C-alpha cells in the first residue's frame, strides 16, 4: 500500500502553559501524518458552473482552475478516489450518482418530509407565514439556475470518479472503498463545505479524518466582510478547530515525493 507524508495544521483552543490563556495567544499547531492513498478520498463540494452571486462564481472559478484542478489531476494519477458531491439536484445529472444510492433514493419523490415540526412551519405558510423572510426579487432566476447547473466541466467527473448526492451515500461509498481520510475542496466555505450532510461537520461526526484544502475554497462574503475576505478566513479557522488543513501546494508536493 503506497503512502504519502504530509504536514497539516490545526487551530489550537488553548495557549502555551507559559502564557495567559487569552485568545490573543491562540495559534496554529502542526501534525505530521503518513496517509495510505488507498484509504484517502478527495471530496469536491458544490463546484458548480453557475451561481447567482457573480463575484463568488468568478472567484471560485479561478480557485477551481488554479488550485482544485491540479489537485484533482494528481489524485487521479495517485489512485486517490475523486468524489464529486454537487447537491442532490445536480448529482442526478450524472449516472455515477446511482452507484451508492439506495432503492428508495432512486424513486421519484424519495425525500420523505419529517413529521415534526409541522409542514406549515417548515414552509413558513398558513399560521406561520409571518415568520417567512421577504421574497428576493431574483428568486425565480435562482430556481431556474438550480435546475440547469452542472459541475464545472474542466473538473469532470471522469468515468472513474464517484458522484454522490447525500451524506449517507458518501458514507456508504467510503465504507465500500475503505476510505477513512477525506480531503475537502469546493464552495462555499461558510455554507455548503461545512453544512451539507456530506460536508465537513457531518463527516467529522461520523468519525472520518478530515483535512480542508484551505486555498481550494472561498466563502460567500458580505458587505461587512468583503474588504478582507473575513468570512473565508473565519470559516477556515472554524473548521481547523476540529479538522486539519493544508494548502494545495503542500498536498501536491507530498504526492510528488511518493511518485
Q: Where do the language-model regions lie?
A:
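Aromatic-lined carbohydrate-recognition surfaces of secreted/lumenal glycan-active proteins
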Residues: 85
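Short acidic, Gly/Ser-rich segments with clustered Asp/Glu that frequently serve as metal-coordination loops
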Residues: 48-53
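Aromatic/His-enriched, Gly/Pro-containing loop or helix-boundary segments
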Residues: 64
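Active-site flanking residues adjacent to catalytic metal/cofactor-binding acidic residues
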Residues: 45
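Active-/binding-site microenvironments in catalytic and ligand-binding cores
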Residues: 82
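Active-site-adjacent betaalpha module
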Residues: 1-41, 54, 58-60, 69-73, ...
Amino acid at each position: 500500500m503506497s503512502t504519502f507524508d504530509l504536514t497539516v495544521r490545526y487551530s489550537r483552543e488553548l495557549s502555551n502553559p507559559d502564557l495567559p490563556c487569552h485568545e490573543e495567544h491562540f495559534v496554529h499547531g502542526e501534525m505530521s501524518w503518513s496517509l495510505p492513498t488507498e484509504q484517502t478520498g478527495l471530496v469536491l463540494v458544490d463546484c458548480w458552473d453557475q451561481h447567482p452571486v457573480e463575484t463568488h462564481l468568478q472567484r471560485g472559478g479561478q480557485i477551481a482552475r488554479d488550485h482544485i484542478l491540479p489537485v484533482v489531476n494528481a489524485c487521479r494519477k495517485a489512485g486517490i478516489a475523486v468524489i464529486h458531491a454537487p447537491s442532490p439536484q445536480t448529482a442526478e445529472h450524472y449516472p455515477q450518482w446511482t452507484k451508492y444510492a439506495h432503492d428508495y433514493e432512486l424513486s421519484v419523490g424519495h425525500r420523505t418530509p419529517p413529521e415534526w415540526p409541522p409542514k406549515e412551519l417548515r414552509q413558513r405558510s398558513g399560521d406561520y407565514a409571518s415568520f417567512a423572510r421577504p421574497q428576493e426579487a431574483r428568486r425565480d432566476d435562482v430556481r431556474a439556475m438550480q435546475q440547469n447547473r452542472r459541475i464545472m466541466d474542466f473538473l469532470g467527473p471522469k468515468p472513474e470518479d464517484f458522484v454522490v448526492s447525500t451524506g449517507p451515500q458518501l458514507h456508504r461509498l467510503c465504507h465500500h472503498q475503505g476510505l477513512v481520510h477525506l480531503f475537502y475542496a469546493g464552495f462555499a466555505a461558510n455554507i455548503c463545505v461545512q453544512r451539507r450532510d456530506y460536508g465537513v461537520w457531518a463527516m467529522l461526526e461520523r468519525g472520518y479524518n478530515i483535512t480542508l484544502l484551505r486555498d481550494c475554497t472561498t466563502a460567500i462574503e458580505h458587505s461587512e466582510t468583503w474588504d478582507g475576505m473575513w468570512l473565508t478566513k473565519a470559516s477556515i479557522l472554524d473548521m481547523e478547530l476540529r479538522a486539519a488543513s493544508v494548502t494545495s501546494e503542500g498536498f501536491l508536493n507530498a504526492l510528488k515525493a511518493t511518485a
